[in-house]
């Protein structure tokens, strides 16, 4: 693609991400954090992919800009049928954007399932710890395990990575199965 077709395609992408064609002549130093993120989204969609990997896409943005970017991603997902693999440490963001969630601990999969199920009925203790660290706790309920209790150490060669700190360890099952 060259010349006027290229410019037209870029202008269309900029409109999709709620920026005007006049952004084509701007330098990065002239853009806010949210505008830079929208440009990154436009670039990701330029090749019209079926799947986009979003790695910490909202991590450096303030809450209002995060909401705008998530709203944009949701709109584009519905409009273009794109699938996202969304990597984030921010569980509120994950909950807002995801249909399915996979929880990793020390690089190993602990839990995977529909977002609603994972958040309402976590089946792995580490998932419970993560959710408990974000949601408002009930002051009358003492958590069995809190995020501060988790000390990073080398994961075991086999079995669940969380077995050394888990309050619900199931003997050989947790020691031998992932």
Q: What is the predicted function of each stretch?
A:
Residues 46-50:
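A short, proline-enriched helix->beta-strand linker immediately N-terminal to the Walker B motif
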Residues 57, 61, 65-140:
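P-loop NTP-binding/switch modules centered on Walker-like glycine-rich loops
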Residues 27, 56-57:
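Walker B catalytic motif
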Residues 27-31, 35:
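Conserved ABC ATPase signature
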Residues 114-178:
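Short catalytic/signature loops enriched in Gly
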Residues 5-22, 131:
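Conserved ABC ATPase "signature" region
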Residues 41, 53, 69:
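Hydrophobic anchor residue at the start of the ABC signature
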């Amino acid at each position: 693609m060259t010349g006027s077709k290229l410019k037209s395609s870029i202008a269309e992408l900029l409109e999709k991400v709620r920026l005007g064609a006049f952004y084509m002549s701007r330098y990065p130093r002239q853009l806010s954090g949210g505008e830079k993120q929208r440009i990154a989204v436009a670039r990701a969609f330029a090749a019209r992919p079926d799947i986009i990997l979003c790695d910490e896409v909202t991590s450096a943005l303030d809450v209002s800009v995060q909401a705008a970017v998530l709203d944009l991603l949701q709109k584009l997902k519905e409009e273009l049928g794109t699938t996202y693999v969304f990597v984030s440490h921010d569980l509120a963001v994950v909950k807002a954007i995801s249909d399915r969630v996979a929880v990793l601990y020390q690089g190993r999969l602990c839990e995977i399932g529909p977002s609603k199920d994972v958040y309402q009925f976590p089946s792995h203790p580490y998932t419970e710890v993560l959710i408990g660290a974000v949601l408002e706790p009930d002051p009358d309920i003492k958590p069995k395990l809190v995020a501060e209790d988790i000390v990073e150490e080398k994961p075991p060669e086999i079995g669940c990575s969380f077995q050394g700190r888990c309050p619900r360890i199931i003997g050989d099952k947790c020691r031998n199965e992932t």
